[in-house]
Design a protein with these regions (language model features):
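Hydrophobic alpha-helical segments within soluble ligand-binding/sensing domains
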Residues: 164-192, 284-286, 301-319
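Hinge/cleft segment of the Venus flytrap/periplasmic-binding protein
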Residues: 200, 214-216, 302-345
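N-terminal helix-turn-helix DNA-binding module of bacterial transcription factors
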Residues: 1-61
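Hinge/beta->alpha junction and helix N-cap segments in small-molecule ligand-binding domains
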Residues: 70-79, 100-111, 166-175, 195-214, ...
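Amphipathic helical "hinge" segments at domain boundaries
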Residues: 50-114
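Flexible loop/hinge segments that line or gate small-molecule binding clefts
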Residues: 133-172, 283-295
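Hydrophobic alpha-helical
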Residues: 125-144, 224-287
Length: 345
């Protein structure tokens, strides 16, 4: 069992003292009763607690961080938020107020979330997810003019200012998928590939499509069609039967760039279609199709780490003025049935 993270607050609770007293005990120049100091240091040593270099942050004003997630697909947004919450708990030594707002894309599109966004106008920093649609540009521009400390998760807008983005590289993901499909089909005379992407107004999906087209050219794959449709509802999944009817058994490989791929997997499985399928992300409903062989491989972008990186780097910027890289990438990995267990708990 993992040991509970020990923080200044843990030590304070065990000894019945204030967190600020615990913080002062580690400063030899701070005014504190020597018996109290000795007790605090002995307790800290007992639990192998070493104060963070930024523990002096306890005596300063509270940092306020807002999170606004406009979600289309719950398994994606949940993992991002989990990563943010875990990072928040690990940085419990600092005075941080974390407020999270979740908005369903079915109820409100990102460009309609100006009121929710403006609640955070006076916060020290803001983390956004789901605002990769070009339609969001106007409200993002207006907001960043008033609060420049904006961090994007999973996407990086092209035409508005932001502090940094925490994301995967869609170029690498597309190249990896194309190379995998090539290796599956390299001994076949026919190498017909279908590409399915999500919202065509999304910078992320557009980048992924362009990179995949180029990778197909490099690896000698025949991209017979690229379909871009809104993946927030059933628009993409409703087209699946007609796509397969159109190509009538001529599809050898498929890459889908959205995590909302269960309908595609169901169709392929139920109709026993022999095709090499590369999907995106892992979640309970998709894992079933990885295990039964419908999905040949899936791209893992580590959404939880994207959320964690966003929060940690933002806090370090606000406290220490550490300037982060403009884009912080998680590793892109390929998951198959044989290693799926390493990524699911």
């Amino acid at each position: 069992m993992l040991q509970k993270n020990i923080t200044i607050y843990t030590i304070a609770e065990k000894l019945g003292v204030t967190p600020s007293m615990v913080s002062r005990a580690f400063n030899p120049n701070a005014s504190i009763n020597e018996e109290k100091r000795k007790l605090i240091l002995e307790t800290a040593d007992k639990y192998n607690f070493v104060p963070n270099k930024l523990a002096s942050r306890l005596s300063m004003h509270k940092i306020k961080i807002g999170v606004l997630v406009c979600w289309k697909f719950a398994p994606v947004s949940e993992k991002i938020v989990d990563g943010i919450k875990k990072a928040y708990k690990e940085l419990a030594d600092y005075k941080i107020q974390l407020d999270i707002t979740l908005v369903s894309f079915a109820e409100k599109k990102p460009e309609e979330c100006e009121d929710e966004l403006n609640k955070y106008i006076d916060y020290d920093g803001v983390i956004l997810s789901g605002f990769g649609d070009v339609n969001s540009s106007e409200i993002l521009k207006k907001f960043s003019e008033k609060n420049p400390n904006v961090v994007h998760v999973q996407n990086a807008p092209q035409d508005c200012e932001y502090l940094f983005a925490s994301m995967h590289s869609p170029d690498i993901a597309s190249a990896l998928s194309a190379e995998f499909l090539y290796n599956c089909l390299k001994r076949s005379e026919r190498k017909n590939i279908l590409l399915l992407t999500g919202n065509p107004k999304s910078v992320l999906h557009r980048t992924a499509e362009a990179a995949f087209r180029e990778s197909c050219r490099v690896f000698g794959l025949n991209l017979i069609e690229a379909v871009s449709k809104d993946d927030s509802g059933n628009e993409l999944s409703d087209m699946i039967p007609s796509i397969f009817e159109k190509h009538r058994g001529m599809i050898d490989g498929i890459y889908i760039t959205t995590g909302n791929s269960v309908a595609l997997c169901e169709y392929i499985y139920n109709n026993r279609i022999p095709v090499h399928l590369v999907t995106f992300d892992i979640h309970d409903k998709l894992n079933k199709y990885i295990n039964n062989g419908t999905v040949s491989a899936t791209i893992y972008q580590n959404l939880e780490k994207q959320g964690r990186n966003a929060f940690e780097k933002l806090v370090h910027y606000l406290i220490k003025n550490e300037i982060p890289d403009k884009k912080i990438y998680t590793n892109v990995e390929l998951i198959m049935k044989s290693n799926l267990g390493l990524y699911t708990y």
